[in-house]
Curated annotation (Swiss-Prot):
Organism (species): Bacillus licheniformis (strain ATCC 14580 / DSM 13 / JCM 2505 / CCUG 7422 / NBRC 12200 / NCIMB 9375 / NCTC 10341 / NRRL NRS-1264 / Gibson 46)
GO CC terms in record: plasma membrane
Name of this chain's protein: UDP-N-acetylglucosamine--N-acetylmuramyl-(pentapeptide) pyrophosphoryl-undecaprenol N-acetylglucosamine transferase
Catalytic activity: di-trans,octa-cis-undecaprenyl diphospho-N-acetyl-alpha-D-muramoyl-L-alanyl-D-glutamyl-meso-2,6-diaminopimeloyl-D-alanyl-D-alanine + UDP-N-acetyl-alpha-D-glucosamine = di-trans,octa-cis-undecaprenyl diphospho-[N-acetyl-alpha-D-glucosaminyl-(1->4)]-N-acetyl-alpha-D-muramoyl-L-alanyl-D-glutamyl-meso-2,6-diaminopimeloyl-D-alanyl-D-alanine + UDP + H(+)
Encoding gene, per UniProt annotation: murG
Keyword tags: Cell cycle, Cell division, Cell membrane, Cell shape, Cell wall biogenesis/degradation, Glycosyltransferase, Membrane, Peptidoglycan synthesis, Transferase
GO MF terms, alphabetically ordered: UDP-N-acetyl-D-glucosamine:N-acetylmuramoyl-L-alanyl-D-glutamyl-meso-2,6-diaminopimelyl-D-alanyl-D-alanine-diphosphoundecaprenol 4-beta-N-acetylglucosaminlytransferase activity; undecaprenyldiphospho-muramoylpentapeptide beta-N-acetylglucosaminyltransferase activity
Amino acid sequence: MRIVVSGGGTGGHIYPALAFIKEVKRHHEDVEFLYIGTEKGLEKNIVEREGIPFKAIEITGFKRKLSFENVKTVMRFLKGVKECKEELKRFKPDAVIGTGGYVCGPVVYAASKLGIPTIIHEQNSLPGLTNKFLSKYVDKVAICFDEAKTHFPAEKVVFTGNPRASEVVSIKGGRSLTALGLAEGKKTVLIFGGSRGAAPINEAVIAMQNELKKRDYQVLYVTGEVHYDKVTAALEKEGAAPNMVVQPFLHQMPEYLKAFDVVVGRAGATTIAEITALGIPSVLIPSPYVTANHQEVNARSLGEQNAAVVLKESELNGDRLIQAIDHILQDEKTLEEMKIRAKSLGVPDAAERLYNVLKELKHHAK
């Protein structure tokens, strides 16, 4: 069996694709994959590090307002479709799956025009432009939030959840926090701002240092590589809390995730899939810079079920952040209730569900 996977730009599109690849390999040892992405996104380094063959194409996303740049984007899209058709004819895949980001536009569109079975996977509650466009041409649309189904042709929609959920649940044991310089047996908070970090979260963490020094819990604070030097310099000046460890990036995050009692971060789809699958309460700070403010919709779906505390970025400061963490951690009853609520929203068998969509498509294509 041969499968083409495409998705990129941010970790939220890439990591679900990798989790899906692992699931297919679990069922078919001889499967061959080709990952199509861009040179500029995070996908090239991440995918090649996993030893998966990678092909780069040149494509940019559409601006939501009319502009000359969109004319150039259309030209790149058409060129990308032509290039993808040639690559697909060469590779001869049994199916093509797009996991979001503008790069999968020409890939999945080209596959549909060649009559190759196609799936798109939408991680968010509000879909992006690329997946909305592709939904007209693909065979199946896999979703992770019920709210997303109204944006797609009803007969194509299948609720699968996010494959990353299955990946974190399947990890046996996990890694010890001592490897990161943290103590075992102590309540621990993970704070991070997504795959590229988030400056407003960093500012709030720096501002809460004096209060954090008085707490009996500990914090792992992942700044994002871009922000690391600036943050460590500010912490040195401010006086970092001794119960906090700072890292630029955590490559094996799924292997550590089970060890955390609370997660503080953005409301990206991958983060939500992981923490709900493991039943981890959270403080969610939706990014206001994403398409149609979809992270706030993601976050509210947890907040309304008492699985998370939702803080808007416009309201974020050091005091508000540490109060939100305290609300969860300093009352054992609240902590346990939120764990149960979070777990009830998880889809731990998401990767298998998505694999079953592929299997069914292949069966009907015969």
